[in-house]
Amino acid sequence: MNGQNIRIRLKAFDHRILDASTREIVATAKRTGAQVRGPIPLPTRIEKFTVNRSPHIDKKSREQFEMRTHKRLLDIVDPTPQTVDALMKLDLAAGVDVEIKL
């Protein structure tokens, strides 16, 4: 795998499990002899929802909810075949979305 990079994008609603998964990926890649760039924190997407508190009247009384999507970016430079095997076998937390590009 000469001259090839693996780009990993991680997304989660909880930043603590996202950071734990990132640390796990970095440790696995370094243990197998690959060079890691990152983790690079990407902008957090904040999605806000405004709803009426009352089911019937009183438009002035509202409540806001928000959903934050935290993102991280990792680049693994010149991965070895052992690195790819170790990353495929890695078991991450349930709330983390992993997107891998070669």
Curated annotation (Swiss-Prot):
Cellular component, GO, one term: ribosome
GO biological process: translation
Xref: InterPro entries: Ribosomal_uS10, Ribosomal_uS10_CS, Ribosomal_uS10_dom, Ribosomal_uS10_dom_sf
Keyword Repressor on entry: no
Any one GO molecular function term: tRNA binding
Gene3D superfamilies referenced in this protein's UniProt entry, alphabetically: Ribosomal protein S10 domain
Source organism superkingdom: Bacteria
Transmembrane segments: none
Pfam family of the protein (one): Ribosomal_S10
PROSITE patterns, sorted: RIBOSOMAL_S10 (PS00361)
Keywords assigned: Ribonucleoprotein, Ribosomal protein
Family listed: Belongs to the universal ribosomal protein uS10 family.
The protein's role, per its UniProt record: Involved in the binding of tRNA to the ribosomes.
Subunit structure: Part of the 30S ribosomal subunit.
Name this protein carries in UniProt: Small ribosomal subunit protein uS10
Organism encoding this protein: Xanthobacter autotrophicus (strain ATCC BAA-1158 / Py2)
Originating gene: rpsJ
